[in-house]
């Protein structure tokens, strides 16, 4: 482990030198790649450097205690030694987590699809609540959220909304959101005050770059048609809506939000590439899960992952048994408590899996 840490530190120092090299600075693509690599290793190096200081401090304190000290000095040295040993344990745990294999998709942007499922109008309204929640969370993180396609219902909900969220490490935080989200509340139209249960589904996919997945033109059928539905004045005037069908997988993506056929096609390609890439990832994950139990369910899209209970202001994440009485804050985009708990659970499970062989 320590040889690995030392090689990471050596590479970090090398990156520092490279990033001040005029030849690298003038090559924007390489400079960005190396900057990203440096940023990804910085925390590991900082923790390792502190660890080395602590180990040295323990050695010094033990050496000091082996000498003839007066009672007060001996007590101070013992106290310092005790504190340093505790810190060493904490740092060792952090190092183990930092050295866990990284999900190669963690630093990617995402495409998120939210759909009203069981529950009709109430499900569509809840899909809208989730959409707003993720938008607010993205804003708080300093990310950019862009709507690619929205199918709005007459009462202000969403049958379906697709958005792209861009920024630093988006997938690493939002990958746990895929699954069925259940809501329990009294609809505004319910005169008897009965609680209704509805469901919305969320799918989170890493954005796939062209270099990662190449979609051959011969494998894509393109259909152009007139926009319909809540498209406003340009409905049926121009054939701007685009439907792409990936023939090998049967995946279909339709876009009509933009007036421009070209823009709709660009957006549709983004979503299609992400869906095909995601299907490949899901198949690989299913194969892995068949041999080993996955820590936190990030794959099974039918899995009920969370319940939002309005009368009790309660949110429960069923995967980790976490219940929080702050539904109003969570729907306002304050998701950190849930996401941090999911990340920690996932990391702890992976550590246990590694230790158990």
From Swiss-Prot:
Posttranslational mods: Methylated by PrmC. Methylation increases the termination efficiency of RF1.
Pfam families assigned: PCRF (PF03462), RF-1 (PF00472)
Location relative to the cell: Cytoplasm
Keywords: Cytoplasm, Methylation, Protein biosynthesis
GO cellular component, one term: cytoplasm
Residues the record lists as N5-methylglutamine modifications: 233
One GO MF term attached to the UniProt entry: translation release factor activity, codon specific
Domain of life: Bacteria
Keyword Protein biosynthesis among UniProt keywords: yes
This protein's record includes keyword Cytoplasm: yes
Its biological purpose: Peptide chain release factor 1 directs the termination of translation in response to the peptide chain termination codons UAG and UAA.
NCBIfam families membership: prfA, PRK00591.1
Similarity section: Belongs to the prokaryotic/mitochondrial release factor family.
Protein name, as recorded: Peptide chain release factor 1
Lineage of the species this protein comes from: Bacteria, Bacillati, Bacillota, Bacilli, Lactobacillales
């Amino acid at each position: 482990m320590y040889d690995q840490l030392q090689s990471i530190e050596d590479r970090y120092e090398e990156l520092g030198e490279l990033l001040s090299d005029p030849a690298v600075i003038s090559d924007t693509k390489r400079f960005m790649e190396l900057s990203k690599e440096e940023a990804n290793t910085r925390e590991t190096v900082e923790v390792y450097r502190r660890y080395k200081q602590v180990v040295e401090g323990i050695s010094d304190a033990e050496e000091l205690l082996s000498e003839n000290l007066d009672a007060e000095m001996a007590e101070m040295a013992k106290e310092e030694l005790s504190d340093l040993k505790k810190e060493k344990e904490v740092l060792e745990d952090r190092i183990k987590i930092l050295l866990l294999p990284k999900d190669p998709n963690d630093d990617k942007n995402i495409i998120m699809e939210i759909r009203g499922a069981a529950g009709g109008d109430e499900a569509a309204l809840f899909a809208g609540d989730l959409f707003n929640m993720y938008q607010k969370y993205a804003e708080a993180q300093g990310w950019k959220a862009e709507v690619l396609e929205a199918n709005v219902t007459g009462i202000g909900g969403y049958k379906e909304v697709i958005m792209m969220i861009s920024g630093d490490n988006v997938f690493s935080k939002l990958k746990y959101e895929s699954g069925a989200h259940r809501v329990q509340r009294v609809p505004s139209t319910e005169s008897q005050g009965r609680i209704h249960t509805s469901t919305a589904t969320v799918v989170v996919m890493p954005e796939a770059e062209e270099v990662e997945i190449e979609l051959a033109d011969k494998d894509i059928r393109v259909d152009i048609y007139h926009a319909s539905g809540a498209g406003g004045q340009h409905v049926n005037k121009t054939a701007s809506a685009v439907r792409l069908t990936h023939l090998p997988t049967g995946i279909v993506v339709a876009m009509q939000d933009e007036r421009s056929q070209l823009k709709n096609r660009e957006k549709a390609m983004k979503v299609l590439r992400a869906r095909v890439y995601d299907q490949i990832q899901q198949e690989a994950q299913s194969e892995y899960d068949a041999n080993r139990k996955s820590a936190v369910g990030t794959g099974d899209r039918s899995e009920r992952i969370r319940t939002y209970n309005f009368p009790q202001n309660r949110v429960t994440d069923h995967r980790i048994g976490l219940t929080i009485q702050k539904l109003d804050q969570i729907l306002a985009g304050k998701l950190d408590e849930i996401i941090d708990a999911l990340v920690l659970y996932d990391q702890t499970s992976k550590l246990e899996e590694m230790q158990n062989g």
